[in-house]
Amino acid sequence: MNSFEKDWRFTRNSGKGFESAELDDSSWEKIDIPHDWAIAGPFSPDHDSEVIVDDPIEHTRKVFSHPGCTGGLPHVGKGFYRKHFELNLKPEQSARVEFDGIMSHAEVYCNGRYVGGRPYGYSSFALDLTPF
């Protein structure tokens, strides 16, 4: 059993081709997991404001802005994580990777090939890496 917590690469971007095994990720941020890129900031009420029209205290209808459900977390978008590793498996061995929780819409690639994913947020899942 190997720990995969150290020496990951991360970028926040909306490009394509990040699953490529040949992608140069040398400029990406070096991180360890667990990692939550949203809490790195910057924070602003403008990032997640919503209009509230009912004032339950004064029993009137007002329009005003206040930070919504994320408390002004930074821009919502896509984050990409990469991990470089080698497996030297014997024919009778297998390998799998376990995720304790990824925010949502996770897609996992190994050597440029789609392995699997999870559409739900912060739920654990495991994937078999043996064929890859």
List each model region and its residues.
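Accessory carbohydrate-binding/adhesion or oligomerization-edge regions at the termini
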Residues: M1-R61
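Accessory beta-strand-rich segments of carbohydrate-active enzymes
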Residues: N2-G15, D36, S44, G71-F132
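Charged interaction patches that mediate protein-protein contacts
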Residues: E50-I52, H66, G112
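N-terminal glycine-rich cofactor-binding segment
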Residues: E58-T70
